[in-house]
Curated annotation (Swiss-Prot):
It catalyses: 2-C-methyl-D-erythritol 4-phosphate + CTP + H(+) = 4-CDP-2-C-methyl-D-erythritol + diphosphate. The record marks 158, 210 as: Positions MEP for the nucleophilic attack. The lineage of its organism: Bacteria, Bacillati, Actinomycetota, Actinomycetes, Mycobacteriales. One of its GO terms (molecular function) is 2-C-methyl-D-erythritol 4-phosphate cytidylyltransferase activity. NCBIfam families: ispD. Catalyzes the formation of 4-diphosphocytidyl-2-C-methyl-D-erythritol from CTP and 2-C-methyl-D-erythritol 4-phosphate (MEP). The keyword Isomerase does not apply. Belongs to the IspD/TarI cytidylyltransferase family. IspD subfamily. Its EC number is 2.7.7.60. This is 2-C-methyl-D-erythritol 4-phosphate cytidylyltransferase. Transmembrane segments: none annotated. The gene is ispD. InterPro entries: IspD (IPR001228), IspD/TarI (IPR034683), IspD/TarI_cytidylyltransf_bact (IPR050088), Nucleotide-diphossugar_trans (IPR029044). HAMAP family: IspD. CDD domains: CDP-ME_synthetase.
Length: 230
């Protein structure tokens, strides 16, 4: 499919099939509540609040489809499909469910507090002509590279490093091409980089942190409590 075949719509893909092992949960991480609301619901609410997303596709384990439909906002905009064993499998399922999309956002459900304004910045850059855009924050800690024995082998220049967040935005044809190449990468932007395509950055937001550990979960709950008190 090329750009002439799409309808120009922005479709957000939300992989939500990963397990909550590091959170000490048996359910998929996306279904773990933060302040009483599942992460995936918070993430979807943020995408809707941004006002720049036309459709949202949430990919969940087959046995969690009914639960996901029940907890997500009733809307023609939001659709739940079966995801895969790996994150890349889930994204592929999302791509297949939106054949007419013009742009894709791939957003971690675990980044449940991502501000709508950040989502708007990503879509704004895509609409302005960028083909791949990711939110990023400067790295504040010193980073060391180490060998297999844990011995330091180098210290990268921190000024050139960025911590990348989601949603990551792409033109539909570019993201489809990246997944068709079937090469290993730790995120969607990494797949695009393997094609030799430039990936642009916009200012990220500390609130778009990924809820991965019990400490992250406590922080997110505290932030939600403070938001509710305002």
């Amino acid at each position: 499919m090329n750009d002439a075949d799409n309808d120009g719509s922005v479709v957000a893909l939300v992989p939500a099939a990963g397990r909550g092992v590091r959170l000490g949960e048996k359910s998929p991480k996306a279904f773990v509540p933060v302040g009483g609301t599942p992460m995936v619901r918070l993430a979807v609410d943020g995408l809707l609040a941004a006002g720049v997303v036309d459709r949202i596709i949430v990919m969940v384990p087959a046995e969690w489809v009914e639960s996901a439909v029940a907890l997500l906002p009733p809307s023609e905009v939001v659709r739940v499909v079966v995801g895969g064993a790996e994150r890349t499998d889930s994204v592929r399922a999302g791509l297949a469910a939106a054949p007419d999309a013009g742009y894709f956002l791939v957003h971690d459900a675990a980044r449940a507090l991502t501000p709508p304004a950040l989502i708007g910045r990503i879509v704004g850059e895509l609409r302005a002509g960028r083909r791949a855009v990711v939110p990023a924050l400067p790295v504040v800690d010193t980073v060391k590279s180490v060998d297999a024995a844990g011995v330091v082998t180098g210290t990268p220049d921190r000024a050139a490093l960025r911590a990348v967040q989601t949603p990551q935005g792409f033109t539909a044809d570019l993201l489809r091409a990246a997944y068709a190449a079937d090469v290993p990468a730790t995120d969607d932007a990494g797949l695009v980089e393997r094609l030799g395509e430039p990936v642009h950055t916009v200012a990220g937001d500390p609130l778009a942190f990924k809820i991965t550990t019990p400490l992250d979960l406590r922080l997110a709950e505290t932030l939600l409590d403070r938001r509710a008190a305002l």
